[in-house]
Curated annotation (Swiss-Prot):
Region (Coil 1A) residue spans: 107-141
Region annotation Tail: where it falls in the sequence: 414-486
Name the UniProt record assigns to this protein: Keratin, type II cuticular Hb6
Keyword line: Coiled coil, Disease variant, Intermediate filament, Isopeptide bond, Keratin, Ubl conjugation
Region (Coil 1B): 152-252
Gene symbol of the encoding locus: KRT86
One GO molecular-function entry: structural constituent of skin epidermis
Any one annotated GO CC term: keratin filament
Entry-linked Gene3D superfamilies: 1.20.5.170, Single helix bin (1.20.5.500), Vasodilator-stimulated phosphoprotein (1.20.5.1160)
Crosslinked residue numbers (Glycyl lysine isopeptide (Lys-Gly) (interchain with G-Cter in SUMO1)): K212
Family, similarity comment: Belongs to the intermediate filament family.
Renumbered residue ranges of the record's region Head: 1-106
Gene Ontology biological-process annotations: intermediate filament organization; keratinization
UniProt-listed SUPFAM superfamilies: Intermediate filament protein, coiled coil region (SSF64593)
Organism of derivation: Homo sapiens (Human)
Amino acid sequence: MTCGSYCGGRAFSCISACGPRPGRCCITAAPYRGISCYRGLTGGFGSHSVCGGFRAGSCGRSFGYRSGGVCGPSPPCITTVSVNESLLTPLNLEIDPNAQCVKQEEKEQIKSLNSRFAAFIDKVRFLEQQNKLLETKLQFYQNRECCQSNLEPLFEGYIETLRREAECVEADSGRLASELNHVQEVLEGYKKKYEEEVSLRATAENEFVALKKDVDCAYLRKSDLEANVEALIQEIDFLRRLYEEEIRVLQSHISDTSVVVKLDNSRDLNMDCIIAEIKAQYDDIVTRSRAEAESWYRSKCEEMKATVIRHGETLRRTKEEINELNRMIQRLTAEVENAKCQNSKLEAAVAQSEQQGEAALSDARCKLAELEGALQKAKQDMACLIREYQEVMNSKLGLDIEIATYRRLLEGEEQRLCEGVGSVNVCVSSSRGGVVCGDLCASTTAPVVSTRVSSVPSNSNVVVGTTNACAPSARVGVCGGSCKRC
């Protein structure tokens, strides 16, 4: 990589060398300490450019060559190199016509390298900004992940509470179901009792109907007997009147005959006594039958009334108990329905909460996976950026090594120039407005100094170019082909 350049414009590199423009007086002696410059030139130095450039000039018949320090003030005393005046006479030397093209190519190459270096620097800055941005995002995602991780125990606690409530509701529903079964059993017992009472009432009603039939039959018999008694009484009355009439008729006949016949009739029939006795017997029978029938009817009626009252009271109590049981059944049914509704609501709430919890957990897992993917991608991007940064730093390190190598070469050259040690090759050309071109190469071999002096007529400038080169063969050549050693 070539790091020396002749700057016709404003270009920068790791080590910028300033070259004169053709046709202009561009080199004068400037006895500054620490920094030497070429007046009238345009150009500059890079990040690690040479702080003290070469200074050369002509003063009268002597030629001075001085070298400034590198990245610091130059030594206070630099010995001048005296050049033989005869060497300044113009020589007819051929100049390579391709030197300008080579210089232009080198200039463009240095510009492109400077542009690449600036692009690398911008890229490094951009990558640093991206690295900071990714670190901020990573910290934000980590904090966000920590914040989201607190939701899972909350959902678990809420779900556990709902499960406990569901278990309590299930226990209450079991208890209510057992109570409902007990009440249904009691209801079945009361239903059986009610059916038994209904059957007993039906039996009592049947007995009452049978007794009523018997009473009716007895009443009919009583009526028949009363009718018979009336008929017998009428018959007795008829017979009595008949006998009385017969007796009256007989007495009238007897009175007409006026014969008194006294007969001792022991067979005297006392009909009145007989009739009275029969009547008394019938009256006694009727009275006794009536009394017995009335007493039996009254007893049966009282018994039936007591039975009806008893069964009515039992039926009323049974109806009240049935109504009470119906109300209790309705109340328990309402409670069971309410418990079932509450249980279904709680189950729906538990299912909804579980679904919401699962949805939240799945969403959290998805977000966590997205964040992990983003984090992994950020890590990969960071790794790529770090790798590119390492590549850029390696390039920068190589450039720094080259700069340090060139600095050491320049320091060694200045030291040799100050001590007067080292091989100096002076080539003189008589071209007008000649430009010195130097190719600089980095190598591990010892530097060799090659100096070319281009001499022009008295109205032209004197340019002294010093080139440090480290070729693999430890040789130094001056561009342009003006020296046979190149």
